[in-house]
Amino acid sequence: MIDPKLLRNDPEGVAANLARRGFEFDAAGYRALDARRRDLQQETQTLQNQRNERSKEIGAAKKRGEDIEPLKAEVGRIAERLSEAETALNEVQEQLDELHLGLPNLLDEQVPDGQDEEDNRVLRQWGGIPALSFKPRDHVDLGELLGGMDFEAAARIAGSRFVTLSGPLARLHRALTQFMLDLHCREHGYTEVYVPYLVNARSLTGTGQLPKFEDDLFRVEHDPSLYLAPTAEVPVTNLVQERIVEDADMPLRFVCHTPCFRSEAGSYGKDTRGMIRQHQFEKVELVQVVRPGESWDALEALTGHAETVLRRLALPYRVVSLCGGDIGFSAARTYDLEVWLPAQERYREISSCSNFTDFQARRLQARWRNPETGKPEPVHTLNGSGLAVGRCLVAILENYQEADGRVNVPEALVPYMGGQRLLGD
């Protein structure tokens, strides 16, 4: 949520910033609605004061033995007007609350201008694209050759956009998860957490998935107050919901492995083959909660932590700064990590690392106690995938394949694979 004070003081400036996203914000309409709120607040306060004064007069008149019926009638009229004013104020406040929740975060000035992914800016690349002497197979064909990747079985169980893994591929999937968790906990200073996979609307609103993106979520029919978590960002960031974190405990760094569930409502016809875009997938998620003045350095560090996974696995990748038209609703700045997939001859997203500044914190009422003032202030929150496990598996299969369809195991994963160095032997 954008700072309400900033919104009231400079709605035109907010509108200009949000226009970089292609988002239209009616600053004049907001000013008029906010002025109406202030007028109604003043009116209700005045009427409350009048009611209280007349009530005191009734008590005094009663003691004097005077006729209090005229005063009681006046109090009744004031109460009726007060009720009408309070109803109108509540309606205006609801409109303002809905408007506030519908506004995306303000963009950082370093976010590139642009309309879509074509306008994103490549910041750096790492690793050479493998020069294969044969036409590379995609991960679906490799999975069929190796055995253990079955989309038909998953379709019988659950429908499209699911997969089952078995044998060495299931073990490789688990090895990736364990490797990522160990790396982030042992070397990057994260605390591993376990969280619910079901989340409520309050939590989804706090991180920004609701109310705008409800169509992307799976809702529990038996209990409509709950949703399947679309990303661990939601439950992990909500660990600080309605909390005041003491300065001595800052910053907080959490890592969490969870399944993620997405309806992919807006992705009809996209990536229908394979594991790239599924209803259920797994991620190792990184979340940081930091002091406001530290969040930009924290974004660089968090992005570096995700990059380390790719470097240890020797997977070629690039880092892209998302433009205003492509960046997520809650983010002030986002870096995407994109890994090279030989069969597609293109880079594909494997992680998004974002600084949300105080946007999520205001929705969550997540604060820290500033030691200089002793007062609670909104924290800054960040998150990024470290990494998406299924897409990482895809990248390993395609980048480490041999001409005969066998796949080498990255050196960093050999200990997690019980010493196995080659899939398909």
Curated annotation (Swiss-Prot):
Its main location: cytoplasm. Pfam families: Seryl_tRNA_N (PF02403), tRNA-synt_2b (PF00587). One of its GO terms (cellular component) is cytoplasm. It catalyses: tRNA(Ser) + L-serine + ATP = L-seryl-tRNA(Ser) + AMP + diphosphate + H(+); tRNA(Sec) + L-serine + ATP = L-seryl-tRNA(Sec) + AMP + diphosphate + H(+). Residues 51-65 have a biased composition (Basic and acidic residues). It comes from the Bacteria. Keywords: Aminoacyl-tRNA synthetase, ATP-binding, Cytoplasm, Ligase, Nucleotide-binding, Protein biosynthesis. This is Serine--tRNA ligase. It comes from Halorhodospira halophila (strain DSM 244 / SL1). The gene is serS.
